[in-house]
Amino acid sequence: MPTLGLTPASLRVVRELGFGQWTPIQEQAVPVLLRGADLVGQSATGSGKTVAFGLPLLERLALDAPQLQALVLCPTRELATQVAGSIRALARHRPGLRVVILAGGTPATPQRQALEQGVHVAVGTPGRVLDHLARGLDLSRVTTIVLDEADRMLDMGFGVSVEKILSAAPTERQTLFFSATFPQSIAAMSKRWQRKPIHITIADNAATKPEIRQVAHLVAPPDRLKALVAILRAHRPRSVLVFCNFKETVRVVTTALTSAHFGAEALHGDLEQRDRDRVMAKFRNGTTHILVATDVAARGLDISGLAAVIQFELATTPATYVHRIGRTGRAGTPGLAIALVVAADQQRLQACDKVSGGGIERLPLPTPTSAKVTASENHTPAVLGAVETLFISGGRVDKLRPSDILGALTGDAGLQATAIGRIEISDRFTYVALSAAVLQQLLRSHPTLRIKAHNFRLERVR
């Protein structure tokens, strides 16, 4: 594995995180970024872009100066949270590094307080960053600005906000655009704000193209719910994202699946941010196996290891269809994409088939014995699992880290490390995956847990 010009500290982290080899975007972009050049990097979602810009970004920071030096803009709060988490992981051997998330859905006051105390990196959404600029955010020491998923930011109407932010930063800086596509709007913005950028395009060839089996089932409109249940029982996906075109349909489908004894959660635009965080924590750690969502609510979600995508209603456009099915089949793992279509959808299905490269199989609804199990690791013996989620009433604002949580649970609480699953820390709360039996026993003996000299409330997430 070549060093790409990275320092020993960066290479140590790469080894510890288990990277066997560089992805194409990483191998080509890292040396360019270490030279300080501007860059337009075009590659698909899930290709390792965060590591590609994160490692060089960290190497350019002056940690002894707690001033904002790098700004990463993302289209959604969820993506900003994921990118910030990745940067923190890459900086594990850079003591003193401070990263703040500047995004909506959470109070702005703690964000302002973090900025006042001094941070090195800010990861945020254009709207919230612009709000902080209006309140005095200082970008005068910023040396690197990254636009992550730049095409989606412009599609979502953030173009004016992004340009206002770029105009508030020093002209002598490194400006990076990462995007899955390179439309004219990105080309025009690059011409205005970048200096002789290097263009890197990673082709979506056979070596990088995900392996996604696409299936369409023709159903009568009144039979959609019955068909969905049949599919879930036949394929038994370990994790599945069910897409609906309207939030009211999300509610109906979630209620129906819950009544049928499937562990399903709804994700739509009416959810408060705390409820959204709770839903996503349960889905990521395996407490919930089925997530029912609209396209808008699912923007920015990067769910690793998603076994299947089911379109309860066919996507309204071919581009949306491609975006939906692209959530599965990542990191070399086969994926399954199923669409329920009615007679009126046939012409749209043909358009989706053409844009996605063909290969949509038109099949009758499966039975448990007829479903093809393409990858055993993507299936579970039962949709309902024995994992539950523990809520801890403290998070990043309390300076909690996963190691603190693990230490308290294995220390004072007496749990075995092997009984503790995914630990997900948000600004003010923490979610931990535990087996149902372990969680029940823990709550009986510990209504609170002492972590870093403070007591935090424990609850079962419902």
Where in this protein do the model-derived segments appear?
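Conserved helicase RecA-like core
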Residues: 1-462
